[in-house]
């Protein structure tokens, strides 16, 4: 084989390899970690709860995948997920609110930004709400607030512990005051849940901001968070411009909030189900003791 032929074969092999790699990536077989750049086999990533095995980066996941990770197989029962948002103000900015709703519904397959229902975690029953950031940034409108409130009332009536997985940009501006009212409505329902001596845990995921942080995300008996999740009310630049100070690099992260007493524990996604099961078992044991002493 001549030197020219050898180089030709090398170029051909590289080209075929490149085409094959691009084809596999286009088929969704591989994913690149946005944090460390490691290329991971997609099935392995899903099996690891969409957490990078190299650096521990928690990739964003949708509400249905979150339910699959948290609950026992085939135990999730949907509640009130037929509610659909409307456009009470006829709101329009660059685009009409009604158009944004239709687009989000088509792209996500959801009616609004939260799924609610009951499930079992290691055979222990629990009420569960999971916000979905894909739907208009997980913003809280009247339907999101109503669904969460109804779930809290259901869990109070059935004496169930409650977990709300938060992932939101805050109140939905397109619904004006109606969206802000959800903060008080949900908080009131949680107070009645607390009066019934029932357990409520919010799980703060990336990102949890705005009116959600200012209401039910911070009202838990135990406040859980995922590693490196962005958690805050106003944006970093707004705070810096208001205070005229440079904020720490880790400001508004789960780790920063835990250090300052706003988060009880940070739970990696791969350990979440077992951690929840342990907390639920302890709470159930304590309930039995209280009933026995009464």
From Swiss-Prot:
- Just give the chief location class: cytoplasm
What this protein catalyses is: N(6)-carboxybiotinyl-L-lysyl-[protein] + acetyl-CoA = N(6)-biotinyl-L-lysyl-[protein] + malonyl-CoA
Locate the residues binding Zn(2+): 33, 36, 52, 55
Segments forming domain CoA carboxyltransferase N-terminal: 29-294
UniProt KW Nucleotide-binding keyword: yes
Q: What is its EC number?
A: 2.1.3.15
Asked whether the UniProt record includes Lyase among its keywords, one would answer no
Note the superkingdom of the native organism: Bacteria
What cofactor does this one take? Zn(2+)
Name its GO BP terms in alphabetical order: fatty acid biosynthetic process; malonyl-CoA biosynthetic process
Q: Which GO terms describe its molecular function?
A: acetyl-CoA carboxylase activity; ATP binding; carboxyl- or carbamoyltransferase activity; zinc ion binding
Per UniProt, subcellular location reads as:
Cytoplasm
Q: Name one Pfam family in it.
A: Carboxyl_trans
Q: Which PROSITE patterns match?
A: COA_CT_NTER
Cofactor binding, note field: Binds 1 zinc ion per subunit.
> What does the record note on quaternary structure?
Acetyl-CoA carboxylase is a heterohexamer composed of biotin carboxyl carrier protein (AccB), biotin carboxylase (AccC) and two subunits each of ACCase subunit alpha (AccA) and ACCase subunit beta (AccD).
Q: What does this protein do?
A: Component of the acetyl coenzyme A carboxylase (ACC) complex. Biotin carboxylase (BC) catalyzes the carboxylation of biotin on its carrier protein (BCCP) and then the CO(2) group is transferred by the transcarboxylase to acetyl-CoA to form malonyl-CoA.
Q: What is this protein called?
A: Acetyl-coenzyme A carboxylase carboxyl transferase subunit beta
Organism listed in the record: Prochlorococcus marinus (strain NATL1A)
Q: Which gene encodes it?
A: accD
């Amino acid at each position: 084989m001549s030197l020219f032929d050898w180089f030709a074969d090398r170029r051909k092999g590289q080209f075929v390899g490149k085409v094959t790699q691009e084809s596999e990536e286009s088929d969704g077989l591989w994913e690149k970690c946005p944090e460390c750049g490691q290329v991971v086999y997609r099935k392995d990533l899903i099996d690891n709860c969409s957490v990078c095995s190299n650096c521990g980066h928690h990739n964003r996941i949708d509400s249905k995948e979150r339910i699959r990770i948290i609950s026992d197989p085939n135990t999730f029962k949907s509640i009130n997920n037929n509610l659909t948002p409307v456009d009470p103000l006829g709101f329009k900015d660059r685009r009409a609110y009604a158009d944004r709703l239709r687009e989000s519904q088509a792209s996500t397959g959801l009616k609004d930004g939260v799924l609610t229902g009951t499930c079992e975690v290691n055979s222990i029953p629990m009420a569960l709400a999971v916000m979905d950031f894909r739907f208009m940034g997980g913003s809280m409108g009247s339907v999101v607030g109503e669904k969460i409130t109804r779930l809290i009332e259901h869990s109070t009536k059935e004496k169930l512990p409650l977990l709300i997985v938060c992932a939101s940009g805050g109140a939905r501006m397109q619904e004006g005051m109606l969206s802000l009212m959800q903060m008080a409505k949900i908080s009131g329902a949680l107070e009645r849940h607390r009066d019934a001596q029932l357990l409520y845990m919010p799980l703060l995921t990336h990102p949890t901001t705005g009116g959600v942080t200012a209401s039910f995300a911070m009202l838990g008996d135990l406040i859980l968070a995922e590693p490196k999740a962005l958690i805050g009310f106003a944006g970093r630049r707004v705070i810096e411009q208001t205070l005229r100070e440079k904020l720490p690099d880790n400001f508004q992260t789960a780790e920063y909030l835990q250090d300052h007493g706003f988060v009880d524990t940070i739970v990696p996604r791969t350990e979440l189900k077992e951690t929840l099961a342990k907390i639920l078992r302890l709470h159930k044991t304590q309930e039995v003791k209280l009933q026995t002493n009464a």
